[in-house]
Each structure stands twice: as structure tokens, then as C-alpha cells.
């Protein structure tokens, strides 16, 4: 696992973009696993600013709310259109259909899409309780794409995007933890003290389904980009035989991070 320590949101965005750019430029027909929310916003802005050539890129999104129309500004369909799809020409884009009449069939359909488009790089944020995607504590590590009931803490965290609490969806479709772990490479980003406990568990906690992000301890190719606040609860002995620590200057000045992330 690589840990890239940044000082600002701008550094995080630049570092994340560099890793994505490398995958896009070196793979013939790459597939990117996309995340939503505030964590990847800067990275997507860098993709727009640099006019990244995404004409050969397929995207698969992590999740989508259930029963939230695609044109709703809080849907992840809308989010992706606004952030990327209206700005860059992708080969193909996929987002789970939370409006499907048969949600179980939609989950199976999405698993088929993932099987046909193996993810080269999966972007992840991390919830305050350690969730990845909408996979809450207690989710089996081998879970496929599934329908989940959102916990109260997750709904409260997302309340800022909605006018009132009753507007926040109660369910979502999410790629399962087993689905996420099939990605060839994972990029997880975390900023701020609110993520510190979850980041501590991810990096130095017990491998446990009670903290979904700890599954990444067993993934062979993970890069975590985090600021000092997000890393503030980690012990100083964060680097060991399983984890290498880098800075943004390492990423930009030599190839060590890129090589270990391939």
C-alpha cells in the first residue's frame, strides 16, 4: 500500500489526476471506477482542466440512490454529467439505475457490466464509519453489487446536499466490496479530521467487516492520498514492510509512486 501525504486539496487533486492520467495513457482501453461526493471533485476538475483524452475510457460508477430520478441534481447520474460526462468524450459510461423497476435484476445487470469491463483503477472516498461505496459496517467482504439501506450516520452526512432530511434517500444500489476488490488498482482519497478515525482503521486497524475499508489491507495495489489531518490519529510508525509513504514532490519528480502503483 502506498500512502501519499498532501498538504492541500489542490495537491490531492493533482496527485490523483497524475495517477489517473498514467492509467489512461498506458492502457489500451482502460476502465475507470468512479466515485461521487466531495472527495473526487478536485480530481475531476483536473481532468477537465487538462482536457484528458478519455475517448478510449469506459467508466463504471460505484453507486446510485434508489428512487431518485436521474435528472435530480442530487442523483449520481446528474453529478457525473455535471462533473465529467458533459465535458469529456468517454467511450462508454455506466451508472447503476436506481429507478429500475426490478432492482435485484439491476444489480445482476451491473455485475455483468463489471465482468465485461474489468476496472483498471477504482477511485474511492471513505466514510466516517469506514464505509466504501455505500457498503456499511457489517457488509460481507465478498458481497457483489447489491441494494443497501443507508445508515442514519450516512444519511446525516449526505443531508448537506438536500433541502431537508426527509428528502435524503433511504436506500441505494452499490458495487459490493467483493466487486470493488476486483479492481486492478485502487485510489482512495481522504481529507480532513472527520476522516481521521476511519483512515486510522484502514491503515493500522484490525482487518474486519466492521470497518469495510480495512478490506483494502488485502488488496495488492492500493494508493491512499491523504492530508495530515486525515492521518492525524495514525501512529508515527505508519511506514512498514507493507506501506510506503510518499509526498507530492515524490510523485511529480520521480517514478517511484507510479511504478509501485502499476
UniProtKB/Swiss-Prot annotation:
Top-level taxon in the UniProt lineage: Bacteria
InterPro entries: Glc/Gal-6P_isomerase (IPR006148), Glucosamine6P_isomerase (IPR004547), Glucosamine6P_isomerase_CS (IPR018321), NagB/RpiA_transferase-like (IPR037171)
Organism lineage: Bacteria, Bacillati, Bacillota, Bacilli, Bacillales
Enzymatic reactions: alpha-D-glucosamine 6-phosphate + H2O = beta-D-fructose 6-phosphate + NH4(+)
Gene3D superfamilies for this protein: 3.40.50.1360
PROSITE patterns: GLC_GALNAC_ISOMERASE
Active site (record annotation): 63 (proton acceptor), 129 (for ring-opening step), 131 (proton acceptor), 136 (for ring-opening step)
Swiss-Prot/TrEMBL GO biological process terms: carbohydrate metabolic process; glucosamine catabolic process; N-acetylglucosamine catabolic process; N-acetylneuraminate catabolic process
Pfam families attached to this UniProt entry: Glucosamine_iso
Family note: Belongs to the glucosamine/galactosamine-6-phosphate isomerase family. NagB subfamily.
Organism of provenance: Bacillus cereus (strain ATCC 14579 / DSM 31 / CCUG 7414 / JCM 2152 / NBRC 15305 / NCIMB 9373 / NCTC 2599 / NRRL B-3711)
An annotated Gene Ontology molecular function: identical protein binding
CDD domains: GlcN6P_deaminase
Catalytic class of the enzyme: hydrolase
Enzyme Commission designation: 3.5.99.6
Biochemical pathway: Amino-sugar metabolism; N-acetylneuraminate degradation; D-fructose 6-phosphate from N-acetylneuraminate: step 5/5
Keywords (A to Z) from UniProt: Carbohydrate metabolism, Hydrolase
Xref: SUPFAM superfamilies: NagB/RpiA/CoA transferase-like (SSF100950)
Name assigned to this protein: Glucosamine-6-phosphate deaminase
Function: Catalyzes the reversible isomerization-deamination of glucosamine 6-phosphate (GlcN6P) to form fructose 6-phosphate (Fru6P) and ammonium ion.
GO CC list: cytoplasm
